[in-house]
Amino acid sequence: MIRLRYFASLRERLGVADEWIPLPDAVSDVEGLKHWLQDRTGPWREALSDQRLQVAVNQELVKADTPVRDGDEVAWFPPVTGG
């Protein structure tokens, strides 16, 4: 199982803050997980298509080719802006 967490406006768009899912067999990295999530029905494709999204695995910012393993926590959040 992996824990998925969604923050800020992304959480609002998806209507979920976090969830536990079995790691899909076809998923080996962050990019693959993103594509798998985008195949869900509802707002997933559009919400995760923003190229500015940040992703962290086990609380460390990572790139799309970072491996995802059983037991990981993967967090998605929009870019942080300030004024």
Please describe what each predicted stretch is.
Residues M1-G82:
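Ubiquitin-like/PB1-type beta-grasp interaction modules and other compact soluble beta-rich domains
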